[in-house]
Regions:
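Amphipathic alpha-helical polymerization modules
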Residues: 1-240
Length: 240
């Protein structure tokens, strides 16, 4: 009986985590460039069998017999598939047609700055001429420097990321990509940051001016999953 209660308990924890992720996806369905998150699940006894290992064999798990100890969250993942493009015709709205990220200088509450990466190209120019995100973070060029533009000039963004002011090239967007997206983690609402082991590479994408990339969230699919998860949670709750 105790094992049955524990199985239901771990099931509730698992479904609660899935529900949190789905809720966050739905909350960001209209967030520009947002990427869907998901979770995987695995049997708790499989994890335990891997952890309890015979020291004579560092790879093979020790045989511990039949168990039924419920389920646990495996790992979180991000779906980096592209969202659809929305026409805005705004000068500083940009979208990337393939894999790649805009480079942004983010400053936290402690005043520490670091480079983050985003697919959200809804930019603007300040009175001082700085190209910034909608949150006021500085957009960086291909050398990692802040981009300054003449607010009164006619600005055109080339497909390769080159920025033209009144027909003359003045800067180039810092568009970066990574060899393995498993080394990227979500940061805040719409940024990504590399973790140890991440390797940068040249981005092979085009820049489209006057467009924004929508999120890749399928609202109907997320709602169906939410109903399924809620029912599974209630079932485990009734067992307890």
């Amino acid at each position: 009986m105790v094992k049955g209660l524990y199985t239901a308990y771990t099931g509730m924890i698992n479904e609660q985590k899935r529900l949190d992720v789905i809720s966050n996806n739905l909350a960001n369905a209209n967030t520009t460039g947002f990427k869907k998150e998901g979770t995987t699940s695995e049997a708790f006894d499989s994890v335990l069998a891997y952890k309890i290992k015979d020291t004579t064999d560092p790879v093979k798990a020790r045989n511990i017999g039949k168990m039924s100890l419920g389920v646990k969250i495996g790992e979180s993942y991000t779906d980096f598939s592209e969202g659809s493009l929305r026409v805005t015709d705004n000068t500083y709205d940009l979208a990337l047609t393939d894999k790649g990220f805009f480079s942004v200088e983010f400053t936290n509450k402690n005043g520490v700055s670091s480079t983050k990466y985003t697919r959200d190209g809804s930019f603007t120019v300040t009175r001082e001429g700085n190209l910034v995100t909608k949150d006021g973070d500085f957009v960086l060029d291909n050398n990692g420097r802040r981009i300054k533009l003449d607010p009164n000039a006619e600005i055109v963004f080339g497909k390769n990321g080159t920025i033209y002011a009144n027909g003359s090239p003045v800067a180039a967007l810092g568009i970066k990509d990574f060899e393995d997206y498993n080394y990227l983690e979500h940061y805040g609402e719409n940024y990504f940051q590399p973790v140890e082991g991440a390797k940068l590479k040249n981005a092979e994408c085009d820049v489209l001016q006057g467009y924004l990339e929508t999120s890749n969230i399928q609202v109907v699919s997320e709602m169906v999953q939410m109903i399924s998860v809620t029912r599974a949670y209630e079932t485990n709750q009734k067992l307890i």
